């Protein structure tokens, strides 16, 4: 049930007045001056801004405040969404994306003809081909108006996905599923896992979008695990659970993102039934999470077993060439909105070399440059390092030194570092020395001869014997295994 438009605008005016009082006039003008109310339903408020950068900033810094203020206006509000104006979503047929040369918005569609839904996140893993004015709309759902899908961002397509060695196999499997549909049973279910910001969401949404383009009437649903839980809980509350489950079982392709967040015994039980029904009916299922199926310990064992029965593919961090291509595309996208933007190729290359973490870290770096460029147009590489130091440090591997390992092991076993380097063969010295050699081999790139030299000029065979000795003991000695884990944590904490 939607609020009357006049009432909605009055509520929005009251909210913006409160917001301005809370954050101050200067911050309000900078970040909320172009905020507009798009829609208010029974439990969801949708606000819009003109750019993806504004949306990301508001979502990252003011989402909780906006939700709090709207709930003061209406306690029934459960969620506040901030979207980019002119970009919409979701589950049935996809309109072709427009380029920045043809970015005029299409004529409005009446609510009876189409249902338009909010977009997902912007740059979120390797999704850098933003296109203004593009739209993905959904055919009206059943007479109840029920909508199954989570936001599907039209910028997340195979064309805008930056491929490379770290994701090429997963991309090939994703394309096969999107093109072959239910005939791609050898990939069923397909499970894609990766750390945050490496392109899982982009890849999953690209599958859904391509499947819709391939077959206009395809029954495709993209869901996040959290959205599934929310919809299921809402359906139970409204005595509509049976209808909700029947709708989900009557689809051709189910795409589930962030599976690690699926919680609750009853909800997992229902999801297990859904998974079994779809797989047994040769319907395609694609799932993504931040770890492999076997490591999702919070999931019901039956769900894990089903997920392990398909193909699991890992997406790794992007290499330098991929990172540079992401930045180039992101700059081209930003220039569609502001042609005066100019970040030199040498700056982009430097950022690609130094920010080696996830795509989201790369986006954060780019947004920093974009923000600074407006009042520091001739930014230098030294200044870039200063601005992005927190990101470059986070992306660098920790440097672990053998001397630090020796110091921490000696302190733990209450011996001196000189004892570790000496020729003494007493039991109280031999064990710590072997542990230190083992950790040096496991935690540093040093060769066996180099480690031997650092331990009083010992031969490499002595180091090899120590490593094998500890490896043999650790399987049967729980106390030793715990000691090694503790020592590893201490060493990592001290690493630069």
Swiss-Prot record:
GO cellular component: cytoplasm; plasma membrane
Predominant location: cytoplasm
Chain residue ranges for the region called Domain III, AAA+ region: 151-373
GO biological process: DNA replication initiation; regulation of DNA replication
Signal sequence bounds: none
The entry's keywords: ATP-binding, Cytoplasm, DNA replication, DNA-binding, Lipid-binding, Nucleotide-binding
Region feature (Domain IV, binds dsDNA): 374-496
Sequence positions that bind ATP: 197, 199-201
Residue numbers spanned by region Domain II: 76-150
GO MF annotation: an example: lipid binding
UniProt function note: Plays an essential role in the initiation and regulation of chromosomal replication. ATP-DnaA binds to the origin of replication (oriC) to initiate formation of the DNA replication initiation complex once per cell cycle. Binds the DnaA box (a 9 base pair repeat at the origin) and separates the double-stranded (ds)DNA. Forms a right-handed helical filament on oriC DNA; dsDNA binds to the exterior of the filament while single-stranded (ss)DNA is stabiized in the filament's interior.
PANTHER family on file: CHROMOSOMAL REPLICATION INITIATOR PROTEIN DNAA (PTHR30050:SF2)
Family: Belongs to the DnaA family.
Complexes and interactors: Oligomerizes as a right-handed, spiral filament on DNA at oriC.
Protein name per its UniProtKB record: Chromosomal replication initiator protein DnaA
Lineage of the species this protein comes from: Bacteria, Pseudomonadati, Pseudomonadota, Alphaproteobacteria, Hyphomicrobiales
